[in-house]
Amino acid sequence: MAVDTSAPSGRLQQTNPDYDPNIVVEAQNLTKIYRDFWGRPKVRALNALDLEIRKGEIFGLLGPNGSGKSTTIKLLLGLLFPTSGRALVLGQNATEVTKNERIGYLPEESYLYKFLTAEETLDFYGRLFDMPAKVRKERVSQLIEQVRLTWAKRRQLKEYSKGMTRRIGLAQALINDPELILLDEPTSGLDPLGTREMKDMILKLRDEGKTVVMCSHLLADVQDVCDRIAILYQGDLKELGRVDSLLKVGDETQVRASKLSPEAEAEIRDVIARHGGEVKSIENPRTNLEDLFLNIVRESQERPGHRSAGADSNSAS
């Protein structure tokens, strides 16, 4: 095993000798079966999941309730142990607790102590990471400004709206300046303005070189910010690839042009040039993520165990 000293606390961490720093998360035949009281298989929550999440991308996990999204997140955090297969996170086995020093996590519900202020809440989490007082103070101030809660930083969280609580929850997930951020329904409870601001913050994290994995039922949000997505259904991976590639309608071509006479429109490229027209773009038209998602779910219901023909686990980032 190699030794990694890049953790915030400076502790030594063991990493896989074959670790590729450009692969932040790797699931290999990852399976989770929940058993009943007698140890008998009850629910196959995740079935032989194989995927890679690359450094610096925003990756979306999509699926209806019971599809295995939350189970996947808990396996990556080490809160659950796989029945078979394995997950590597930042070069370490996901069951290694030390890797969590380099991870930020925003759960679907932010369980924060309601009688603390925003400043006190973030200071508490900074202490958990053994951050020095001066560094902690600067980091708390920076994060409160980043999530736009400076005006409410000394109010107790019990006075916060759901949207404000989500923002301070995001700040809590970022307190340790993590390399990997896991977000479960990050825009839940936010109004349209708050949703836009949250998406802008997620995009900024990518610009800073961080890797973001987000679960969401709000498909428009995923379409807006994610580079690649995985669609799960009843524990099976149904689709994997870049959002822009998955949404292309492959058997159609769309041409957008300006300054064209009616005659020029009929003959496309040659006539466009001959008549002085300007081609704006020639590309495959796209569906939207909601239609793609619903089509995959319907196909999965009609053909259990089938994975969509267009799935591409090797899409370039």
Predicted regions and their residues:
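Conserved acidic
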Residues: 19, 214, 285
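ABC-family P-loop ATPase nucleotide-binding domain
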Residues: 1-40, 300-317
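Hydrophobic alpha-helical segments with strong N-terminal bias
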Residues: 13-16, 75, 199, 232, ...
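Generic marker of residues within folded, mature protein domains
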Residues: 17-20, 116, 245-247, 272
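ABC transporter nucleotide-binding domains
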Residues: 22-27, 32-227, 231-233, 239
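Short, charged/small-residue-rich alpha-helical element at the C-terminal edge
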Residues: 243-317
